[in-house]
Amino acid sequence: MERLENCAQMFQRKFLNEAFRRHCPVLLACIALGGSLLKELSPLPDSYWNNKRNVLNVYFVKFCWGWTLWLLLPFITLTNYKLTGSITKVLRRLSSLLVGTLFWYLCTNLFLYIEHITGSCYESEALLDSIEHQDRKECRLHGGFWHGFDISGHCFLLSYCILIILEETSVIRSIQFERHWHRMAINAQFTALSILVIIWVWMFLCTAVYFHNIFQKVIGTAFGMLAWYITYRWWYLQPISPGLPPASASHSEKEPVYKN
């Protein structure tokens, strides 16, 4: 258990710290722009990471929101209850995950709709001979290649999940442990979320340097950052909202940190 605690402290000190939280939106924007320019001006040679069948893409990125939701659900429950002692406040905070799910659903479907209305079906990726098909599904069913404006869903969701995790894990610095199992459970969840952030940042970088064009990646990243800004920087500050994590709320209101 000591190793787990040391690991959690290391992640808190080196990765999920206040400086990283504050500068992460700028970092993501730089990765999206820098990686896109690298892809356009000096493409990297093929590697394991531009193979869509790589293990992180197949087992993690494909289920990006599921992994984020699955790990944040118990973390928010335990940490928010320890800081507030109120089941009502915990349920209110958990509703932020429903809001995140709604943003994920709406944006994903919007991207698919844009790709549909801007796309056409072709016989191959060379985009030489077009085929008459109504939509992407029908096109692919008949062996065609659908080409439209494909906003990067990876850039959107990875950036959004990274920023959400950073917001929700900010409570870790405010918790004082009295019980061993509290420390063990929360440290384990915090460590898992820290590893997940590292995976998401790495795969965001891989997407930036290997896939899509610059406009598709920048727009996808902008949607992810906008969804985060609308919620955590504006709406969650309002009385009728899921609210900010307890540490963030008390910090912004200049109140003493919650203790249990």
From Swiss-Prot:
Q: How does it sit in the membrane?
A: Multi-pass membrane protein
First-listed, main subcellular location of the protein, grouped into a coarse class: endoplasmic reticulum
Q: Where are the transmembrane segments?
A: 24-44, 58-78, 94-114, 145-165, 190-210, 211-231
Q: Which residues lie on this side of the membrane: Cytoplasmic?
A: 1-23, 79-93, 166-189, 232-260
Tell me if Endoplasmic reticulum is a UniProt keyword of this record.
yes
Which reaction is recorded as catalysed by this protein? an acyl-CoA + H2O = an acyl-4'-phosphopantetheine + adenosine 3',5'-bisphosphate + 2 H(+)
EC number(s)?
3.6.1.-
Gene Ontology terms for molecular function: coenzyme A diphosphatase activity; diacylglycerol binding; triglyceride binding
Report the active site residues: H154, H212
Q: Write out the topological domains of type Lumenal.
A: 45-57, 115-144
- Domain of life, per UniProt, equals Eukaryota
> Would the keyword Lipid metabolism turn up in this protein's UniProt record?
yes
Q: Can you say where in the cell this protein is located?
A: Endoplasmic reticulum membrane
Output the Gene Ontology cellular-component terms: endoplasmic reticulum membrane
Q: Which UniProt keywords apply?
A: Endoplasmic reticulum, Hydrolase, Lipid metabolism, Membrane, Transmembrane, Transmembrane helix
One annotated GO biological process: phospholipid biosynthetic process
Q: Which InterPro entries does its entry note?
A: FIT, FITM1/2
What does the similarity note say?
A: Belongs to the FIT family. FIT2 subfamily.
Write out the function statement from the record. Fatty acyl-coenzyme A (CoA) diphosphatase that hydrolyzes fatty acyl-CoA to yield acyl-4'-phosphopantetheine and adenosine 3',5'-bisphosphate. Preferentially hydrolyzes unsaturated long-chain acyl-CoA substrates in the endoplasmic reticulum (ER) lumen. This catalytic activity is required for maintaining ER structure and for lipid droplets (LDs) biogenesis, which are lipid storage organelles involved in maintaining lipid and energy homeostasis. May directly bind to diacylglycerol (DAGs) and triacylglycerol, which is also important for LD biogenesis.
The protein in question is named Acyl-coenzyme A diphosphatase FITM2
Which organism is the protein's source? Xenopus laevis
The upper taxonomy is: Eukaryota, Metazoa, Chordata, Craniata, Vertebrata
